[in-house]
Amino acid sequence: MPKHGKKYLEAAKKVDKTKLYEPAEAFSLVKELSFAKFDETVEVAVKLGVDPRHADQQVRGAVVLPHGTGKTRKVLVFAKGEKAKEAEAAGADYVGAEEYIEKIAQGWIDFDVVVATPDMMGAVGRLGKILGPKGLMPSPKTGTVTFEVAKAIAEIKAGKIEYRVDKAGIVHVPIGKVSFPVEKLVENFNTLMDALIKAKPAGAKGQYLKGVTVSSTMGPGIKINHLKLVK
């Protein structure tokens, strides 16, 4: 277990570990307990009742948060011809084809999201071992393999985030900054949870939402009352 600093331990004392907080109360506490000198990211960890080893229990998708995440995301688009021009006009940070495939193969990774037109996926697929483990591989499930590149870029820039269950059955997602008003954090949180509930795989058995914890980058985890989230 990592050793926590004095400020973290002081903040952790103010969290009732036996309590399931309502979302607004939890986010108020996250803001109150933030002690870092930078605008911390507010993160949500959702424990799901799925076994990700089974193909019919995968949870992956994307959702546009109404208030964004507070982070400007760099978008790389793999496209050619008219679609490349469309991507540039829509505000993509990088647009190209083979030259960027070569660059990534050599270790360049200065981007947050990758979008590709379907005709480029044969070439982009060669980067699977590099982009896959980083969660950057384009996918039709998250709307990042598409000919509608302008729409994809607009959604990403507006606050579209991707979610994916990890090997432990947990989804980790940033939903804003500590500087956000509580109301905006709650609205982003509700949007995410609605998307996760709708994404429940057919193969999931038993209780689907097993636990929800929120925290700031440096702060302690606060448990949210997940039992009220399932309508």
From Swiss-Prot:
**One of the record's GO cellular component terms:** large ribosomal subunit
Q: Which UniProt keywords apply?
A: Repressor, Ribonucleoprotein, Ribosomal protein, RNA-binding, rRNA-binding, Translation regulation, tRNA-binding
Question: Could you name the domain of life of the organism this protein comes from?
Answer: Bacteria
Q: Which InterPro entries match?
A: Ribosom_uL1_bac-type, Ribosomal_uL1, Ribosomal_uL1-like, Ribosomal_uL1/biogenesis, Ribosomal_uL1_3-a/b-sand, Ribosomal_uL1_CS
Question: One GO BP annotation here?
Answer: regulation of translation
Keyword Membrane set for record: no
Q: Name one Pfam family in it.
A: Ribosomal_L1
- Recorded GO MF terms: rRNA binding; structural constituent of ribosome; tRNA binding
This chain's function reads: Binds directly to 23S rRNA. The L1 stalk is quite mobile in the ribosome, and is involved in E site tRNA release. Protein L1 is also a translational repressor protein, it controls the translation of the L11 operon by binding to its mRNA.
- Partners and quaternary state? Part of the 50S ribosomal subunit.
Q: Which family does it belong to?
A: Belongs to the universal ribosomal protein uL1 family.
Classification via PANTHER family: 54S RIBOSOMAL PROTEIN L1, MITOCHONDRIAL, LARGE RIBOSOMAL SUBUNIT PROTEIN UL1M
Q: Which protein is depicted?
A: Large ribosomal subunit protein uL1
Q: Which organism is it from?
A: Carboxydothermus hydrogenoformans (strain ATCC BAA-161 / DSM 6008 / Z-2901)
Q: Which gene is transcribed and translated to give this protein? A: rplA
